[in-house]
Amino acid sequence: MIEGKPLISRVTTIKGCVKEPANLRLRMGTIVADAIGECGGYTDEAGKIVMGGCMTGLCAPNDQVVVMKGTNGILVFNEKDARSYEESPCIRCGRCVEACPIGLNPYLMKHLCDKGDLKGAEANNVMECIVCGSCSYVCPAKRWLTASFKNTKDAIMREARRAKK
């Protein structure tokens, strides 16, 4: 609530493969396809739509999802730019550690997450990860660090909720 009024809209940046990139005030619940239509439509066939920004955003399954409170950006990628890379084994370069703004050890956390070791990941502070994407961005092996941490954090939270019941 701002000034006693509920949040029903927000300014959202729409960029990428759209004809007229813009900052639009969108109401909560606006369909992404309609927002892109306000920008003149697609310039190319959309290969991927990212909701929330390039570092911490999440891929939308299609353009029929809706704008929510956290939707500060919509990025549209064409097929060529949307291709995902094969993850390579960690080369232990340490760039992820240097990039982490809160001093975590992403390479170790990723190893534990990949093994499904929730307790080990939690003991190595995966819950402290702010999911900023810096580690994934600098990784020369194209490791999907951030996604792995987010999924592991979600799994730990699910386990905690289950344990409370």
Residue ranges and their predicted role:
Residues 1-141, 147-154, 162-165:
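Redox cofactor-anchoring modules in respiratory/redox and cofactor-processing assemblies
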Residues 157:
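Positively charged, low-complexity nucleic-acid-binding target-recognition regions
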